[in-house]
Amino acid sequence: MTVTTGRPGRGERRDGGEGPGGEEPPAVAAKIAELLLRHAAEALPKGTSQGTFRIDWAGPVDTELPDERAVQAACGLQHVHGRATGGPVPLAVDYASVVAGVLAALGATAVGVGRARGLRLREARTSVAQGALLAISQYLAAATAREGGEVEPPVPEVGDSGGYLGLATLVSLDGHRIEIETLDPEAWREFWTRLAVPPALSGRGWLPFQQRFATAVCPLPEVLRQAARRHALAELREAAYDTGVSLLVVSSDPLSTVNPAPWRLTPGPGQGQDTATGVEPWGFGPPAARPPGEPLLPLAGLRVVESTRRVQGPLAGHVLGMLGAEVVRIEPPGGDPMRWLPPLAGDCSARFLALNAGKRVVEADLTTARGRAAARELACDADVFLHNWAPGKAARHGLDAADLLPARPALVHAWASGFGDTFGDRPTPVGTDYLAQVYTGLAAAVRPAGEPPAPSLMTLTDMLGGLVSAQAVVTALARRAATGRGSGVESSLVSAGALIPRPARRVEWAALDRPLPTADGHLSLGPRARRNPEAVHRVLAGGGDTRSRTTEDWRERLAGAGLTATPVLTDLAGLARDPAFKAAVAPPDPAAPYARPHSPWTFA
């Protein structure tokens, strides 16, 4: 395995030293990619080839991005993460770098699969900026939908307890911070009824609670927060247990209590004839030819069948499609209800399209024997079957790996779960993003010391979990290319969240770690500026209050002192109009009336 981080001329050096702006190459991204490729190699026969990867900060984005903080500022992560707390603020972890690291490993493993199929590929290239843009793709689509783009949520206020009212985190009478989750409106109503909140009042909180996945803000009515503060943790736990609501205590410890492997691969049966192909063993055929001018992608000609919902599973299928696979999506009769959630891009939800555009849809009612038989037939004619159902549901449907692999030994069966088997025999919480952030310590790690711990309402583990699931799938495809046999692979939101490096104690921030407010926005200081507060203060002292001058004015003044700074993007729709992002973001057009990031890879 060969690793290259950066490229000369874009603030990177191949010798690992600092670039011209004093910035370091994206070492966290490279470390994550190396970790995942080592884990993949453990599942592959000795000598199996994987491709190489190259990562830099900016990729096709035509602006200077010297570090993680600059990428988060320029690509919208600070904006989306900060929606719930009153304004743009960095994630206190290297989230964009981790996403880029997974993309690099995924691309390199896909290169190996492509080579096994006769493609002349060597290297996958990606960047931290492209990882960040993929991470905000749903929010970008919603902001740019042609049929009335999403209105930015109002800036949340600070509540009586000192916490922002845009977060979903509640505080108990005895001072514990808690996160609750349910996808059932009846369970929601019953939980609050147990806390003496009338249904007419609790119902007002249901919509913002459910929409927080899409909007990254949760303006719950103050009456609900007050009701929680009147009850001790034990009472809240009892109410949650009795009503089927999941509840976890938000710890101030940033370290994960569990550290599962990124994914688990279980080899399929080692002998027997594949009933779909009639041959044994079974591997790959060469990809079908593409029209002149279209790049031949590593997974071209392979078929993925998915039965997924929300973010994690659909994203896994989406990126496999970006790698060239044909993706077939099983939806209930009448279509996935998420298709009609506003804002619409044409006749479909912009957020839904951000993860599902280009997939062929087959409708099947999996609650019926006929629907399950149809799904089985699709799976047994595919290379990959992917789902993110609740634990035990695949077995009840007769669509588990143990059910499908005997009939289709070449199949890769992928389960993307919330918590995997980390809870053992104990009741498992609802497998959603925010509870996974709490369980893995991310709820503490994403915010600096001095701030109350709370999950980011940006869907961090959902996005990362989808990418890790896709990496597990491509690893299993690489194994199949070498052995002719399929596998079952399992990954989870927890296994993805545990990938994000964080210190044993929450990070301490100085004033300059936060974006500086200006007359027309915010400015995020570069690494050299943050390391030299005296130099920054000399510039600021000569210019008055930071709000007295524009972002560009301050950036020029800082540049005159040899200090870099990045304007903080707070208008996602602006990405599609910014010439610097022309090669990274596709603007709305008649065929796709919403903005979306281009593929995060180029292959050589």
What kind of feature is each model-predicted range?
Residues 1-69, 73-335, 376, 405-422, ...:
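Acyl-CoA thioester-binding alpha/beta core of soluble enzymes
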Residues 429-447:
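Flexible glycine/proline-rich, aromatic-decorated loop/lid segments
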Residues 444, 448-469, 474:
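Core active-site phosphate/anionic-ligand binding loop and the adjoining beta-turn-alpha structural block
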